[in-house]
Amino acid sequence: MECELVDLSNNNVGSVELNPLIFSAKQKLSILHDIVRWQLAKRRVGAHKTKGISDVSGTTAKPYGQKRTGRARQGSLRSPQFRGGGIIFGPVVRSHAYSLNKKVRKFGLKIALSLKYLNNQVVVLDSLNVDVKKTSKMCEYIKNFKFSSFLIVGDYGDDLLRAAKNLHYVDLIKPIGLNVFDILNHECVMLTKDTLKHLEGRLL
């Protein structure tokens, strides 16, 4: 699978071979769905919390005698039926993360990259070694590509990161951090030659 190799100005500088095991995987959208749910569950903070009967402040004394009052028996003023009482079975601080098979995660990454390649939304860059320090200069480069949002994957410098930081439609990510959710969340995926080598070592 041969793909055009371009620079950030979208000028052709050669060609590069794409591994068909990564960029022509069988499409199984159910796996993408499972992985996106897994990623979103992992990133949930889970900081919701209500006070239970043991957390609310108040006396522990029995409010009145068990018998001879004619009222329903009560053992605590912190019970949920009283004003200011605790919440029963309320949310507690917890992790929403769950495990997902490593083979499934690898396969999902192949499916996502194949889907982008199938829709002509993969761009292979020769490198990210460009002198970009201003956001305006980064905008000039990005305008050479006719897409609405970009995920740039490669080993970038601090200057390039700073230049792209203020563009809401451009995200930079290291090859080790490439994931299904970010791939699907951007229209165009830009990969460097070095990233392709990294993916072969990671996914094959």
UniProtKB/Swiss-Prot annotation:
Molecular function as annotated in GO: rRNA binding; structural constituent of ribosome
GO biological process: translation
UniProt entry keywords in alphabetical sequence: Ribonucleoprotein, Ribosomal protein, RNA-binding, rRNA-binding
A Pfam family matched in the record: Ribosomal_L4
Location of region: Disordered: 56-79
Highest taxon listed in the record's lineage: Bacteria
Gene Ontology CC entries for this record: ribonucleoprotein complex; ribosome
Alphabetized SUPFAM superfamilies for the sequence: Ribosomal protein L4 (SSF52166)
Keyword flag Kinase: no
Family membership noted in the UniProt record: Belongs to the universal ribosomal protein uL4 family.
Function, in words: One of the primary rRNA binding proteins, this protein initially binds near the 5'-end of the 23S rRNA. It is important during the early stages of 50S assembly. It makes multiple contacts with different domains of the 23S rRNA in the assembled 50S subunit and ribosome.
Quaternary data: Part of the 50S ribosomal subunit.
Protein name per Swiss-Prot or TrEMBL: Large ribosomal subunit protein uL4
Organism: Wolbachia pipientis subsp. Culex pipiens (strain wPip)
Organism lineage: Bacteria, Pseudomonadati, Pseudomonadota, Alphaproteobacteria, Rickettsiales
Originating gene: rplD
